[in-house]
Structures are given as C-alpha cells and as structure tokens.
C-alpha cells in the first residue's frame, strides 16, 4: 500500500478491533447466562420467599450498546516463517534528509552553452539616407509565380474585318398594294461589263480645240552685242550659304618661288603670310596600318543606361476591385462559313413609291440564252452615213455652200494626252468666299518684335459663357447646428442672407441611387434627329415563325435605301494575295531619327545637269529702271487647236445610271486645284472601251494658236560695253526656284488675311517635357485612333546598331520559267563534288600483281563456339575482393543441444517510465523560435464604421512620374478663336516657311533620276521556278564554304592505353548483369544480317577523357573511281508556271542593298564543255580528307545474292530537322532571253564586286526600328532602367535562311558566363527486375565487347590469379570530332514577315559525281551541346570493368537459385578504344589543371560553368568535430565535396590497434538547403533534402573571390570573367564553441545564397541531423567609406534587414 492508503487504514483497523472485542465479551456473557448453578444453596433456587416457579427462558434480546475498548492482550507466540512473498511495489519517496555538510570544491566544468538571445531592444531611429548603391547584378531567375487572377475586361478592340458574303436569301412575294412602300437598297457597284459592239460611225465633229503649244524652238543665233547698259541699283544682300564644292580646276603651274600677289589697288600680298579660308573636307585617305596599342586603363563608369527590357514577371498582386465595364470588344476572328439556316419568317412588306421603277438588287450575270426567234418589225433606225457630196452645177467659185448653223455641244471628249509643257499661268481668279475657320495650328515660335505698350482698352463685352469646370473636391462635413425650439406653432422666418461667394466647381459626384419613377411629363417638342446609334448586341434567335402566305410580284421593286448596318461578320479565311496596290500618298514627315552622326561619305561624282525647273513664284517688284523697248521677237510656234468641230450623231445608248443619287453634292476645290472626293453615288467600274468608230469628216480649220514657248537660249553674244544706269524697270519674269536662303531677319507684321480654309492637322510638335501626373477621375482609355496617312520619305537615317538576326522569310512560290539565255562564257573548273554513294560491283578485272603487306585488319566478327579446352593451370591468387553486401537471411538452423549455464548477465536496462510528475516550476523564457510559415489569407473583415474627419496632412513629396497614359481620342474642334490683331507693318514681314502643303496630284513620269543611294534590303523574294538547263560554264565563283567533314577514316594503329580516369558516378540500378567472364576463343562465325534500327533515347552520354593522339597510319593507295550510281526515284512534279506576256522593258531601278541569301536553286543540266577557266583562289581548308582506299585490288569476289527487302523504317520525328550542310555551288546557267515584262521579284543574286561609289541620292525614308542590339558582356553593371512599356507578343517566325559567311572578325574577349540554368528534374529510379529461372550451364561464349556497367554484384569467391597477359596492340585512331560551331553571325537581315504559305517541294535534282576529298580544315571552336542524338543500336558487351567504389546497398532483390560454378575462362582480348569525347576547353598547358568547387545550397547537383568538365559530384562538407575539436574544410577546395554522405563519415583509432565507429559524440557539419526547418531531428531518408549538393569542376585557370564590403556587387579584375555572385561567408562556430572559417580569396567564401544558418549539424552516434541553437555563422558586413571615423554602433537586425548589411562578393576566373 501506499503511504496515504496506510494512513487511512489505521483508524479503521482500530475500530474493527474494538468492535470485535465487545462482541466476544457479549457472547461469553450470554453463554454463561444459560448454565444452571448447583453449587449454591437450594440448588440455585431462592427458598427465602416460599415456593416460586420459574418460567422458560425468553428470546434473545436486542444487542446492547458498544462497550468500552478492552485492553491489549499479551503478545502471542512467534509463528513459523511464512513463504517468501512477491516483490512489493516501489515505495513512496522518503522525506528529504538532513542537509549534508558542504562538499569539496569540484573540478572546473566545461564552458556552458551560450545563453538565449535577450529580448530585442526598441528599434533605433532611422539612419540618414545612404548614398545610392551601385547597380546590382541580375538576380537568378525566380520560379514562375502562381497563375494570377483573371484581369479586368479589356478595352474595345478595333472592328473586325468584313465577313463573307452571305447566302442569297429566300424570295418573298409582296402584294401589289404594298410594293410601293418599300424600296430596295442601292446595289453594289456592278461588275465590269462585257465589251460592247462597235458603235456606228459618228457625225462630223465640231471644230477641234486649240492645238497644244508647240515644242520650244531651237536655240536662236547669238544676239548682237548689246549696248552699254545703265548701272543698276542693288542692295547688299545677306551672305548666302556656303556653295557646293566645285569641280577640280586644272593643275596649276608648279612654282619654285613664292611670287607676291599685287592687288589692283597696288597693295602687295605675300601668300606665305596669309592663311586662306578653310578648305572643304578632303576625301578619305587610304587605310592606314595601325599597331595594336597597349591596353587602356579602366574607364570611369558610364552614364546611366537606357531603360532596360521588361523585368521578369512579378509575383501576382492582390485581387483588385472590379473594374469599370469595358467597351464592346472587337469582333472575333472570322469563323468558318456556317451551314444554311432555316428559312426565316416572312419579311415586312416591301415599299415602292413607283411600281414602274421598282428594281431589285442587281443579280449575277446570267448565262447566254438560247437563240431567240426573229423579232418584230423594228422602229426606224438612226440616220445613215452622210452621202457623198452632190454634183455642183454652178461655177467653181460658187461650189462651196454657206456655213451651216452651229451644231449642238458635243460630248465630253476623252482626256487628252499629257502636255509636254505646262501652259502659262492663268489670270488671278476672283476672290473666293471666306473659308470656314481652320483647325487650330500648332503654337508658333516666340516672336522677336516687341511693340510699344498700347493705351488701356475699353472694357470688353461680356465673354461667352465658359465650359463647366471640373467638379471640385467634396467639402468637409460641417458641425451639427443647434436646434432652437420656439414656443409658437411656427418659427419666425428670417430675412434672406447675403449671397455667398461663388464656389469652385465640384468634382464629378458618385452616381446616386436610382430615384423613384416620376410622373409622366408633358409632351415635349420634337427633337432633332439623333446620331446613328451604336449597333446593339446580337439578340438571341427567336422561335421559328410560321410559314407566310405566298404572294407573287410581277414588277421589280426599286432599289431601297441603305439598310441598317449588319452585324459584323465573322472573320473570313485569308484571301488569296491581292494585286499590288496603287502608290500611297506621301506621308507626313516622320520624326527625326535618333542615330548618331555617321562619318562623312565619299565625295559623289559630278551630277548630270538637271532639267529646267518650273517658273518660280512671282517675285517682288525689282528696283531697276524701265528698260528700253526690245526688238521684235521671232515668230511663235504653232497655236492651240481651234474650236470644237461639228456635232456628230448621237452614240449608242449608255448603261442606265444609278437611281437615288444625291444631286446636291458639290465638289469642293482643294488648295492645289484638285477635286476633293465627296460622298456621292458610287457607280460601277468603268466598262471596257468599245471599238473605235470610223473617222468622221475633217473639221474646219482651228483658230490661230497661242504663241509657243520661247526657244532655248541662244549662245551668249559678245560682251557689250557697260551701259548707263537705267530707270526703274517693269517686273521681270519669274525666276527659277533658288536654293533656300538662310533665315532672314524678322519683318514687320502683315495685314489681316482673309480667313483661310480649314488647314490640315500640323505635324507632331517636338515632344514636350514630361508633365506632372494627371489626376484620372473615372477616365477610361479611348478607342484606338485611325491609322495616320503615310508619311513622306524622311531623311536618310544614320546607321543603326547592328540588329539581331532577322526571322527567316517565308518560302516563296516558284517563279515563272525564264527564257533560254545565250550561251555564256566558259567557267572555271568546279569545286570537287561531294562523295557519291558507292558504285555497283564492277566486272571482274584481271588478277593484279601481289600487293604490299596491308594494314592490320579490323577485328573479325565473333566466331562459332570453339571446342572445350583443357583445364588451365591454377592461377596466382587474385586481389582481395571488395567488401560484400549483406547476405540474405539463411534458412532456419537445426535445434542446438542444451548449452551450459551462462555467466551472470549484465545490469538490466532501465525500467519503464514512471507516472507523470507534478507540474514543475515556470522555466526561464526560451529563445525565439524559427520564423513560422506565412498564414493563410484571412477572410475580408466587416466594413468598419465611418471615422471622423482627420486633420489636414502636410503636403506630400512630389510624386514619381506616372507611366505614360494611353493616347487619348481626338478631341472635338474647339470654339472659333478671336480674329487676329493685325498691326501696321505686319504685311511687309514674310513669315517663316509654312508647313508642307497637301498632297498634290500624281505627277507624270519624270525624267530619269540620278542614281540613288542603296535602298533598304528587300524582303526575301519568292523562289523562282526551276530555270532552264544551262550550257555554258559559269564564271569563277567565290571561295566556297568549308566542306562537310569527311567520312571516318580507317582505324589507325592502336595507341598506348590512356591514363586512369577518375572514378565514374554511381549509376542507378542497371539491368541484369552482363555474361560472366569470356570463354575460349571460337572460330570465326558467318556474317549475320543487319539488325533492326534500335529505339531512340534522348540521354546524351558523358564526355570521356581525351585520349592521347595515336600514331599516324600508313597512307593508303588511291582507290578507283566508283561507277555511276543507279538512277534515283522520280521526284514530285513541280507546279506548272503561267507563261507571262512579254511586257515593255521597265525603268532602271535603284541599286538595292544585297538581298538576303535565297535558297539554292535547282540543279541545272550539264552545260557544254567550256573553255578552261582561270585558276581559282585557294579555297578554305576543307574538312579532314577521307582515308585512302585499301591496297591493291584483291581477287575478284563473286556477285552477292540480292538482299531481302527491309522492313519500313520507323517514322521520323515530327519536327523540322536541322538545316543541312550547304550544298556545292551550282553551275551558272545560260543568260536568259530578253523579257519585256517585269518578272516577279527574283531571288537575290550572289554578292557582286564592289561597284563604283554612286552619286548621293535623296535622303531615304526613315528605316524601321531595329531590334535591340545584343548586349555585350560587361563587368560594369548598369543602373536599373525605368520600367518599359510591356511589349506585345510576337508571332513565332520561321527559321531564317543561313546568312552569308561573315567577314573574319577580330578575336573577341571571352564572354561572361551565363546565369546558371534551372536545375534539371531528377530522374526516377527504375525498378529492380525479377531474377530469371536458373539456366543450364552454357557453352563457352565468345569474347564479348564492353557492355554497360552493371550494379555491384555479390562478393564472389576468391578466384585463382590469372596469367599476366601480353600488352595489347596500339588502338586505332579515334573518330573525327563533331562539326565545329557555325561561323560568326553575318549582318542581320530585316525581320521577315512570318507567313504560312504552303509550298510543294521542287523536283529532285540528279545526283552529282563524287568529288575528291578536300584538304583537312581547321578545327572549329567548340560547338554548343547538341540535341540528344537518336538512340544508337545496342552495343556489344564490353570487357569487365574495374571494381567500383563501395556503393550504397541497393534494394534487396528476390533470392535466386544457386548456380553451378562455371569454369574459369581465359583472359579476353583487349577492347577497342572508345570514341573521342567532345573537345574540352583549351588548357594552358598539359601540366596545369585547376579545380573549382560549386555548392548549390539546394538538393540538386549544380552545373559546372560552361566549358568545364565535371569530375564528380557529391555533398557539401563544412567541417568535422572529433574529440571536441573541429577540423575545417575550405569550401573552395575539392575536399569539401564528398562523393557520399554519412552522418559519421570517419572513425577513430587508438594506439592499441583498435578503431571505433559511431561510438562517441562526434559530429559532422554540412552546408544545408532551403528546406523548411524541422521541429525535431531528422534521420535516414529525411536527411537528404537538407544536405547541399556540390560539383567539382576542372577549370582552365584559377578562380578567386573578390569582396565589396558593400551591398553592391564588386567587379572582376580586368581580364577576368565572372563565375557567380554571392555573399561573403567568413566563419562559423557550433557545439563547444568550435568551428572554422574560409579564406577570403577562396571561392568558398562567396556563397550564392545567404542564410542566417547556412549549415546543419549531424550527430554521428545517433545518425540524426538538426539545426541546434548554438550554431552561429559569421559574414563580412558592409562598411561605410569613412572607415576610421567613429566607433561601430551596436545594432540588431531582424529578418527583413539582414541582407542590407551583408557584404557582396563575386567569384572570378582569369580569361585565357
């Protein structure tokens, strides 16, 4: 019992003992009461009172009360010892003992753990604003954020394209009484009519019009010498602009001495004492030869760069409030044409006011009708042709009759041919009525004249009421008024107050709630017709109506009014390409380009004399005196044609005109006297002209023409004597337009002009300065504006930066076949062709002579199994095997015999835990826990109550400039402005040159222009049709592109074995292991058939180590040429081209830039044998040549049997293949025959020789904006740019054709390393296969080739040592490497317009002959990693690999049966050397190899920087702790990357040759990942996500870390490139205040990611890892530039501010 139980049981026991004692006493007493006593007198009877009788004893009475407690009895005798009881329960804890004496002083204990962090202090005041930091480097690309919420409804898009024409509707009959009420819509323009029949001969025409002015007469003879003229008056003009550079003068006479120049005034000038004016800019000199200068010092940081590209997509913001409803969206893309719908309900009754004019829509032209029956008698015909003149009876003088009457006005004649020369300007017309007010022009420049201040004007009339202002802000809520109650029923009404000041206009209020419906109002006045409404939404289709009554219409209704605009149709399919459009109007001047000024161009050649200009504007009156009367001029040219002839007979009836034309439309005349097009009736297109009628009789002679233009000037006459000064002459003729003079002085203001017509909108003004951000109050973006008129060609832009390569243009349609050209000149011999396929077997030749000893043969195929050999000798003992894996659990053993008694056992384990104790005292506060995960997003709270009005805040700082708003819609025209004030004198001031006038009419064909500048590159033309075969060899071509690499050579002599490589990686569990050791050699087996093509697998192999170069093989003899191959299959038929009509020769076009390189043309037929060409230039070094053919021809072989038909190959992948290697250049075809029609745009030709410099053409139009240039790598980080506008997503272009090879560039410096790629997803581990059934022992197999590496097998028995084999022969030379990377990128072409044009492949050309092998080419630079190749055929099993490193135990497989032990096989032949790996980075020398360690701080293996080989990967070890001492690892050295992980990777040994593993509290520390912090220590597989991975890379140079001690990224030294950026990690401590640190020059001191706890502690004894509270990391901090001023101030940083105080670093490697 417990202590408490015994305390309770004591009093109860005593009560039971007392009760028992009383009971025993009463029992004894009652027993004695029934006993008769005979030893007393009278035998117990009382005889004293006479005889008494005693009745029987009564029943037992009730128990009496409890008696008093009896005394304790004496102790009883000692009983026998009882049986030993069971062990009692553990007793209660005893009372605390007496405090013992004070003990001795104990030994000094170890240092305690650091205490918990103190309570954070209050945040200090914010420091002053720091200096702007350096621009940070680009961060690593973040993971894509979650998908954001759907955006608000977009703005209305532009209207969609017009839908397709609908199907013809069902006819509907109208009753006769309703036909007049409806009219049909105006029909669309009719189709082009068929050509009409020839008209009847016309009547005699009227007198023709005045003839055109005659051509200018020939130059007159030189005039006689004039008289001496008067001296003219002149003003000293303003200095003109500098004239053009004149043509070179004749060479002067060389002079040895300087002759003084004697001026007319007698003053002598010495040329050597005076400096002439600055000459014109000289021509460029010849190209100089410069030596490479020394490397300059590092420049200052550049200016702030332009805004960068758009940043990465940010994290999604919170869901915004619902936006305003957008405008109606654009029509969707055109859908497919729907099926015919159900017949609609009957339409409304038609209405036609005139039944006779009722006309329906114009139908389609019908088919020709059948031959009709003969018609009825027709009406009288038109008058016949005039008869011949009648005979005359009178005299000859009287034969001519009187003139007839004037005929009626003739029809309008056809437009005449353009006049060769313009007529003289007509007289000034009458002044037109004032035009409407023009649109407000752009603000003019500030004036220069300042007038005197005028007198104060009178008070003006009241102005027009202004437009209502913007609504003002809402006022503050007023205080509550006091309520004053009055005694009476009504309050006394006060007097009206004074009017208050005018309030500001309020802002637009929030829309009020919908009011109650008002009472109906009175009928209002009829309103004006409303504007055309917006088309409503398409309603839901109504129910199908009942079929209407059928009615018949006999007359065709009139064309009705235009119907309501229909619902926009769905977007139609892409139409066929239209014809070329007409030339567009010249656009407005474009904005000036922003290129930098280019270098001066070469001087142009002298231009040809220009044509005579048109007369200039009327100049101001001259100041000369009137001249003398001139002499009579020469006779003028022929006059204009005479008056119109007589009226002819009426022509045939015209086509009926359109009805409902608006006859009130007037045609306004524009500024250049051109007719402006106004909306009127749209007629059909003009029909084809009829056949010409017979000529009419000759008209009367025309009137005398106006005098012709003056002839060309005659030669100059001899110079006359100077005349006297003349009087003021009449105004001279207008002069030619002179060059534009410099800006004159500001004149006086001119008089008031009459209001001009509405001007065109002015050009865009210069961009204004950035305005303040406007307040947007409920504004919405306007609709998209109309497209502007195309601008006029701008000035030639400066050369832009080099753009990126353009998109690949679409493949064009085949061109029309050209005509056969004349035979060309013979060309040079062609380049060697590609190797053709092997020829067919030839006829057996005569046996040749015995040849020399051939090369070593290729290893033969596997032979048949040989006979079993004799058992070999027992070999020497083999090497000690590796530690085997744990064996499988054995079967249960037999029951053992009874053992002897064991020795006493050890102390037992502790018992089970006791019951929970009482609640302990409150402990000391714990440390801050780790930061919790962010909670889920809470629900929105209830709206709070309205707060009281706050105080006015202080004005805020000036806000940042807002992003540019969307372009607003065009505003309404403003109210007319006040008339201008015209001061006297203004009329005499000529204004500045006005804006460009409206576009003139299209001019006639001008004279041939001078040669212009090269045009912008044309788009890629469509390929032409295949050309006709040429017969003449082409001219010598350019140097060809390097040939494709040759076929693999024959194996060379085997090289010596390479050095032992590093251990390979631990692969995942492989398939079933390769066969056992090789058997005996078998005989050579028969040749097997080719196997099927294996599957494709996209796993690239790891590059092997580069083997040593093999010895050069013996060159083989030259082989024979193969015979011609079999004819190929017939290709697909090409598209038949349309034969073009021969057109007139086109004008000579301007020279364009070289076009993009088109696709190669089809191969022409063989040309005729040409003359021997000249020797070509040395070609590029070709790829490595083919190896020579084998030795002399052997004995002829028999013809083989035809092979069986192969199975169809697996379908190819559905992706575009890589572009093939360039084919050989085709031979040049014959010149084509002349063609007069301009052909389609041809494929750009090959690059021609450099032409002579052209003359300077007019400025070109501004080029399209180029793509952003490729940003060169830079060590200097730019400042962050402003946020750019988001770009639109472009369509994916087709792959462009390969550009021409660029010119050889100077060797560039090595670029920076790119950002690390995203880690790949780890592959899934395959399942272990089941063990197969036990097989019988097989025959001795042939030696297999090397197979894939199997997983580690169970440890076998130690075999006998085999005999040492002979050294194998030197391996053959390895295969050639992969093709090198493409050459430098050429100049970028224009971005092509991606189009999807379906093309058909052309016909396949005949196969070329096999060319000789080219010379070996230079080794190209290392290409980028290629796409994963297709899976090769399964390889043969290779020899057994070396023993691998002890691997982690794999999954336990199923237990297989025990196989028979096989015999020991002989040693297999050495395998062939493997294929060479990809070329590595160039090393500095063979003896130098640097190692670079990269830690990912994630659970993914990091990638080595580009060009570096990965040697191994593993886990990031920071340091060990053993015997309470730390051993640190440098994270920049390879020792910090252990290939395998264990919580206890080491053991310790004592001097007694005894080692212990995981037997004490030793620890290992590893770099950790970003996995969430665990609450408890993790063990086993849970550890892996917390351990950082690492890779050891082979670097060509040493890598160092540089630290900025600032928040900015430091720069690498000059000549070094960046590998990664990070944070400066200094040192670390953990348990027992032990730890270590990093060398600040080591890359290990620059971790890419910052964590307050970057490493995790693993306990070796327990096998667990955890983040304990005593781990500290130490980092370099940011230090201000004033290093020695003031002491550091203590500070505590929370999680969000830590990175602002951590120094940044960068790991750099020297460029080689």
Curated annotation (Swiss-Prot):
- Supply the InterPro entries for this chain: Collagen, Collagen_IV_NC, Collagen_IV_NC_sf, Collagen_superfamily, CTDL_fold
Q: Where is this region: Disordered?
A: 60-237, 302-448, 507-640, 690-906, 1157-1480
List all Pro residues biased stretches: 215-224, 433-445, 752-766
Chain spans, region Triple-helical region: 184-1484
Tell me where on the tree of life, at the top rank, the source sits: Eukaryota
Q: Where is the signal peptide?
A: 1-25
Q: Where is the composition biased (Basic and acidic residues)?
A: 175-186, 511-520, 571-582
> Keywords in UniProt for this one?
Angiogenesis, Basement membrane, Bromination, Collagen, Disease variant, Disulfide bond, Extracellular matrix, Glycoprotein, Hydroxylation, Repeat, Secreted, Signal
Q: Which residues carry this modification: 3'-bromotyrosine?
A: 1490
Cysteine-cysteine disulfides: 1504-1593, 1537-1590, 1549-1555, 1612-1708, 1646-1705, 1658-1665
UniProt subcellular location: Secreted, Extracellular space, Extracellular matrix, Basement membrane
Could you name the Gene Ontology cellular component terms for this entry? Answer: collagen type IV trimer; collagen-containing extracellular matrix; endoplasmic reticulum lumen; extracellular exosome; extracellular region; extracellular space
Effect after changing residue 1389 to R: Found in a family with porencephaly and small-vessel disease in the form of scattered white matter lesions; likely pathogenic; impairs COL4A2 and COL4A1 secretion; the mutant protein is retained in the endoplasmic reticulum
| Ranges of compositional bias, category Low complexity | 68-84, 140-153, 628-640, 698-710, 721-730, 769-778, 813-823, 831-844, 1302-1328, 1400-1421
Domain statement: Alpha chains of type IV collagen have a non-collagenous domain (NC1) at their C-terminus, frequent interruptions of the G-X-Y repeats in the long central triple-helical domain (which may cause flexibility in the triple helix), and a short N-terminal triple-helical 7S domain.
* Function recorded in the entry: Type IV collagen is the major structural component of glomerular basement membranes (GBM), forming a 'chicken-wire' meshwork together with laminins, proteoglycans and entactin/nidogen. Canstatin, a cleavage product corresponding to the collagen alpha 2(IV) NC1 domain, possesses both anti-angiogenic and anti-tumor cell activity. It inhibits proliferation and migration of endothelial cells, reduces mitochondrial membrane potential, and induces apoptosis. Specifically induces Fas-dependent apoptosis and activates procaspase-8 and -9 activity. Ligand for alphavbeta3 and alphavbeta5 integrins.
**Can you name this protein?**
Collagen alpha-2(IV) chain
């Amino acid at each position: 019992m417990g202590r408490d139980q015994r305390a309770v049981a004591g009093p109860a026991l005593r009560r039971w003992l007392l009760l028992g004692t009383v009971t025993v006493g009463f029992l004894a007493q009652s027993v004695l009461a029934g006993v008769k006593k005979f030893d007393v007198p009278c035998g117990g009877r009382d005889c004293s009172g006479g005889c008494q009788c005693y009745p029987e004893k009564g029943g037992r009475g009730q128990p009496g009360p409890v008696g008093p407690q009896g005394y304790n009895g004496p102790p009883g005798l000692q009983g026998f010892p009882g049986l030993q009881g069971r062990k009692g329960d553990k007793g209660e804890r005893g009372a605390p003992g007496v405090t013992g004496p004070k003990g001795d002083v104990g030994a000094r204990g170890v240092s305690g753990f650091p205490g918990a962090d103190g309570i954070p202090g209050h945040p200090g005041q914010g420091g002053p604003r720091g200096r702007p930091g350096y621009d940070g480097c680009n961060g690593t690309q973040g993971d894509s954020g979650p998908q954001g919420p759907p955006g608000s409804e977009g703005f209305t898009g532009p209207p969609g394209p017009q839908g397709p024409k609908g199907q013809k509707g069902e006819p509907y009959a109208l009753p006769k009484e309703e036909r007049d009420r409806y009219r049909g819509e105006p029909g669309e323009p009719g189709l082009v009519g068929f050509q009409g029949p020839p008209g009847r001969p016309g009547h005699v025409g009227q007198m023709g019009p005045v003839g055109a002015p005659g051509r200018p007469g020939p130059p007159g003879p030189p005039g006689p010498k004039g008289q001496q003229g008067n001296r003219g008056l002149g003003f000293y003009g303003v200095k003109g602009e500098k004239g053009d550079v004149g043509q070179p003068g004749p060479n002067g006479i060389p002079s040895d001495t300087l002759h003084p120049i004697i001026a007319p005034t007698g003053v002598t000038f010495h040329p050597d004492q005076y400096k002439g004016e600055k000459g014109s800019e000289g021509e460029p000199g010849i190209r100089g030869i410069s030596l490479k200068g020394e490397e300059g010092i590092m420049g200052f940081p550049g200016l702030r760069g332009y805004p960068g590209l758009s940043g990465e997509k940010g994290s999604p913001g919170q869901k915004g409030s619902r936006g305003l409803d957008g405008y109606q969206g654009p029509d969707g893309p055109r859908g497919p044409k729907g099926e015919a719908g159900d017949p609609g309900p009957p339409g409304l009754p038609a209405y036609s006011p005139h039944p006779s004019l009722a006309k329906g829509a114009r139908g389609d032209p019908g088919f020709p009708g059948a031959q009709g029956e003969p018609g009825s008698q027709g009406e009288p015909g038109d008058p016949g042709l005039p008869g011949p003149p009648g005979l005359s009876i009178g005299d000859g003088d009287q034969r001519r009759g009187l003139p007839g009457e004037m005929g009626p006005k003739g029809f309008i004649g056809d437009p005449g041919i353009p006049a060769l020369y313009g007529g003289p300007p007509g007289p000034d017309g009458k002044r037109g009525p004032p035009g409407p007010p023009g649109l407000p022009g752009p603000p003019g420049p500030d004036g220069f004249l300042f007038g005197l201040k005028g007198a104060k004007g009178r008070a003006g009339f009241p102005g027009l009421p202004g437009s209502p202002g913007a609504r003002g802000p809402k006022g503050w809520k007023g205080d509550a008024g006091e309520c004053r109650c009055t005694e009476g029923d009504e309050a006394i009404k006060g007097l009206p107050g004074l009017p208050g000041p005018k309030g500001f206009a309020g802002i637009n209020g929030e829309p009020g709630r919908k009011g109650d419906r008002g009472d109906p109002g009175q009928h209002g006045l009829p309103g004006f017709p409303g504007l055309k409404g917006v088309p409503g939404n398409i309603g839901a289709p109504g129910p199908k109506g009942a079929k209407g009554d059928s009615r018949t219409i006999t007359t065709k209704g009139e064309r009705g009014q235009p119907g309501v605009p229909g619902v926009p149709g769905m977007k139609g399919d892409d139409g066929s390409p239209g014809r070329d459009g007409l030339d567009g109007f010249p656009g407005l001047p474009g904005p000036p380009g922003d290129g930098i000024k280019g270098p001066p161009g070469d001087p142009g050649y002298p231009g040809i004399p220009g044509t005579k200009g048109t007369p200039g504007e009327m100049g101001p009156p001259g100041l000369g005196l009137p001249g003398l009367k001139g002499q009579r001029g020469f006779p003028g040219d022929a006059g204009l044609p005479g008056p119109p002839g007589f009226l002819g007979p009426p022509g045939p009836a015209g086509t009926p005109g359109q009805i409902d034309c608006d006859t009130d439309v007037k045609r306004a005349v524009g500024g250049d006297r051109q007719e402006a097009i106004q909306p009127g009736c749209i007629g059909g297109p003009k029909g084809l002209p009829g056949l010409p009628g017979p000529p009419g009789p000759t008209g009367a002679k025309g009137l005398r023409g106006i005098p012709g233009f003056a002839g060309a000037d005659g030669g100059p006459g001899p110079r006359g004597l100077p005349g006297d000064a003349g009087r003021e002459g009449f105004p001279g003729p207008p002069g030619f337009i002179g060059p534009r003079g410099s800006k004159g002085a500001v004149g006086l203001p001119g008089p008031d002009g009459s209001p001009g017509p509405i001007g065109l909108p002015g050009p865009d003004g210069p961009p204004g300065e950035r305005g303040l951000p406007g307040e947007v109050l409920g504004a919405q973006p306007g609709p998209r504006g109309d497209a502007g008129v195309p601008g006029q060609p701008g000035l030639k832009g400066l050369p832009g930066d080099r753009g990126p390569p353009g998109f690949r243009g679409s493949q064009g349609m085949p061109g029309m076949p050209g005509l056969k050209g004349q035979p060309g000149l013979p060309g040079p011999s062609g380049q060697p062709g590609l190797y053709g396929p092997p020829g067919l077997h030839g006829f057996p030749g005569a046996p040749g002579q015995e040849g020399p000893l051939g090369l070593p043969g290729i290893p033969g195929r596997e032979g048949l199994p040989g006979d079993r050999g004799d058992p070999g000798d027992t070999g020497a003992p083999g090497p000690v095997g590796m530690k085997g894996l744990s064996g499988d659990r054995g079967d249960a053993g037999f029951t053992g015999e009874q053992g002897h008694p064991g020795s006493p056992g050890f102390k037992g384990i502790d018992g089970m835990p006791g019951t929970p104790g009482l609640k302990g005292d409150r402990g000391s506060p714990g440390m801050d826990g780790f930061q919790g995960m962010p909670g889920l997003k809470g629900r929105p709270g209830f709206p709070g109550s309205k707060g009281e009005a706050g105080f006015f805040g202080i004005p805020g700082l000036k806000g940042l400039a807002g992003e540019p708003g969307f372009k607003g819609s065009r505003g309404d025209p403003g109210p007319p402005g006040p008339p201008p004030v015209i001061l006297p004198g203004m009329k005499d001031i000529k204004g500045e040159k006005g804006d460009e006038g409206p576009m003139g009419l299209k001019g006639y064909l001008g004279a041939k222009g001078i040669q212009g500048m090269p045009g912008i590159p044309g788009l890629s033309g469509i390929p032409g049709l295949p050309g006709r075969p040429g017969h003449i060899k082409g001219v010598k071509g350019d140097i060809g592109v390097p040939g494709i690499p040759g076929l693999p050579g024959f194996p060379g002599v085997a090289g010596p074995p390479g050095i032992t490589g590093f251990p390979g990686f631990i692969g995942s569990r492989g398939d079933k292991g390769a066969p056992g050791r090789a058997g005996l050699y078998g005989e050579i087996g028969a040749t097997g058939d080719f196997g099927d093509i294996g599957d494709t697998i996209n796993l690239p192999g790891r590059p092997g180590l580069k083997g040593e170069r093999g010895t050069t093989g013996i060159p083989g003899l030259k082989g024979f040429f193969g015979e011609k191959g079999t004819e190929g299959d017939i290709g697909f038929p090409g598209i038949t081209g349309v034969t073009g009509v021969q057109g007139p020769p086109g004008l000579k076009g301007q020279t364009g830039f070289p076009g993009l390189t088109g696709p190669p043309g089809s191969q022409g037929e063989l040309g005729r044998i040409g003359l021997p060409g000249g020797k070509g230039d040395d070609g590029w070094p070709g790829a490595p040549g083919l190896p020579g053919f084998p030795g002399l021809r052997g004995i002829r072989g028999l013809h083989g049997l035809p092979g069986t038909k192969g199975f169809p190959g697996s379908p190819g992948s559905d992706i575009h293949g890589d572009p093939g290697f360039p084919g050989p250049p085709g031979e040049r075809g014959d010149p084509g025959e002349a063609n007069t029609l301009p052909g389609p745009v041809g494929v750009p030709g090959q690059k021609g020789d450099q032409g002579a410099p052209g003359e300077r053409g007019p400025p070109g139009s501004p080029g399209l904006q180029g793509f952003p240039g490729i940003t060169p790598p830079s060590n200097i980080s730019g400042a962050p740019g402003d946020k750019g506008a988001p770009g639109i997503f472009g369509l994916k272009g087709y792959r462009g054709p390969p550009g021409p090879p660029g010119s050889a560039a100077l060797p560039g410096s090595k670029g920076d390393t790119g950002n690390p790629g995203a880690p790949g997803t780890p592959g899934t581990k395959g399942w272990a296969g089941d063990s197969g059934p036990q097989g019988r022992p097989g025959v001795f197999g042939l030696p297999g080739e090397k197979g894939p590496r199997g997983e580690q097998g169970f440890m076998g028995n130690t075999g006998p040592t085999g005999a040492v084999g002979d050294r194998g022969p030197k391996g053959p030379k390895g295969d050639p490497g992969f093709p090198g990377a493409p050459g430098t990128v050429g100049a970028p072409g224009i971005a092509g317009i991606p189009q999807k044009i379906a093309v058909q492949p052309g016909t396949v050309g005949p196969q070329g002959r096999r060319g000789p092998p080219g010379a070996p080419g230079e080794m190209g630079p290392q290409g980028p990693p290629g796409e994963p190749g297709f899976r090769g055929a399964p390889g043969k099993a290779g020899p057994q690999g070396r023993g691998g490193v002890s691997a982690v135990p794999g999954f336990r497989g199923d237990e297989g049966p025990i196989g028979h032990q096989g015999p020991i096989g002989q040693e297999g032949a050495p395998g062939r050397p493997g294929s060479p790996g990809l070329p590595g980075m160039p090393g500095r020398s063979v003896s130098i190899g640097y190692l670079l360690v990269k830690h990912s701080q994630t659970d993914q293996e990091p990638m080595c920087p580009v060009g570096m080989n990965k040697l191994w990967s593993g886990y990031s070890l920071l340091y060990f702790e053993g015997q309470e001492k730390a051993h640190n690892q440098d994270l920049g050295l390879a020792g910090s990357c252990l290939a395998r992980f264990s919580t206890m990777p080491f053991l310790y040994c004592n001097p007694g040759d005894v080692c212990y593993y995981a037997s004490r509290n030793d620890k290992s520390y590893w770099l950790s990942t970003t996995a969430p912090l665990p609450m408890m220590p993790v063990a086993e597989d849970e550890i892996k996500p917390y351990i950082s991975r690492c890779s050891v890379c082979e670097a060509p140079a040493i890598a160092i870390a540089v630290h900025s001690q600032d928040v900015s990224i430091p720069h690498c030294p000059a000549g070094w490139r960046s590998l990664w950026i990070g944070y400066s990690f200094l040192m670390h401590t953990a348990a027992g205040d032990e730890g270590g640190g990093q060398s600040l020059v080591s890359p290990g001191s620059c971790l890419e990611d910052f964590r307050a706890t970057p490493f995790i502690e693993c306990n070796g004894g327990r096998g667990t890892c955890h983040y304990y509270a005593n781990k500290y990391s130490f980092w370099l901090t940011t230090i201000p530039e004033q290093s020695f001023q003031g002491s550091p101030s203590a500070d505590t940083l929370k999680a969000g501010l830590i990175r602002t105080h951590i120094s940044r670093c960068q790991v750099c490697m020297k460029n080689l």
